[in-house]
Amino acid sequence: MDNCDFSGYATRNDLLCGDGVTIRKDAFKGNDGCEVPLVWNHEHNDPNAVLGHAVLENRDDGVYAYGVFNDTEQGQTAKKLVQNGDVRSLSIWANQLKKIGKDVVHGNIRELSLVLAGANPGAYVDFVMAHSAEGEEEMEVSWDENIMLYHSADTEKKGENKVAEETIKEVLD
């Protein structure tokens, strides 16, 4: 999409989300081409939390979003946060969900939020366009798989914190 301020995955398919659900392919295909509000942290009750809008594109691996910030103070602040890489995570709010077990197979995306940490590990900004006052445009492209760092202090030492491996039957007997 031309003239977007940023783009990235609103949600990715087949990844276990922090809320315990997994979004499956084409669950939101009905939103392909739709424009939804871009909101700060799912704040639905505050009009000042609306930062702009996003156009959604259904893809084989998820729903991609092209975001445009509005010219409000909040919209421009959010734009700077995204341009600086301070906020990179995206999150959807959807309703009319149909699930098979913990798999979301259908739904309707109502808004896209910029969040500090999203539930879907594949939902993040991967492209930022910077528009200059002279009319020139610059872009930053990144590929971020939200890498988890494990420090040596986090690893379990042999013999410490060993979890008992008893069956339920053994515990009840």
Language-model segments: what does each one mean?
Residues E43-H44, L51-V55:
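Polyanion/phosphate-binding surface patch
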Residues D19-P47:
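Small/polar-rich, solvent-exposed N-terminal microdomains that initiate assembly or binding
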Residues D26, E73-Q76, K162, E166:
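Generic alpha-helical secondary structure signal
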Residues D2-G8, N13-C17, E35-P37, H53-D154:
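Residue microenvironments linked to proteolytic maturation
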Residues G159-D173:
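Amphipathic alpha-helical oligomerization/scaffolding segments
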Residues D46-A49, G75:
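Short active-site-adjacent helix-start/loop capping segments
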